[in-house]
From Swiss-Prot:
The modification Cysteine amide is found at C66. Belongs to the conotoxin M superfamily. The keyword Endoplasmic reticulum does not apply. It comes from Conus textile (Cloth-of-gold cone). The keyword Disulfide bond applies. Pfam families: Conotoxin. This is Conotoxin TxMMSK-01. Keywords: Amidation, Cleavage on pair of basic residues, Disulfide bond, Hydroxylation, Secreted, Signal, Toxin.
């Protein structure tokens, strides 16, 4: 009886391996790098000066401010 259960278990594992089970690893919360790419940073702001690495005008939505 136990050998039949063992054969059934091995057969099931061969037909349906655990790697075939879909994991939730593709959820956005598990991929912080992609979330950071979607973030709008000050460097993309139209008033950002890349030479001085600060914002020239209207520093309300852009940091750091050149002053």
């Amino acid at each position: 009886m136990m050998s039949k259960l063992g054969v059934l278990l091995i057969t099931c594992l061969l037909l349906f391996p655990l790697t075939a089970v879909p994991l939730d690893g593709d959820q956005p919360a598990d991929q912080p790098a992609e979330r950071l790419q979607d973030d709008i940073s000050s460097e993309n702001h139209p008033f950002f000066d890349p030479v001085k690495r600060c914002c020239r005008l209207l520093c309300l939505s852009c940091n750091p401010c050149c002053g």
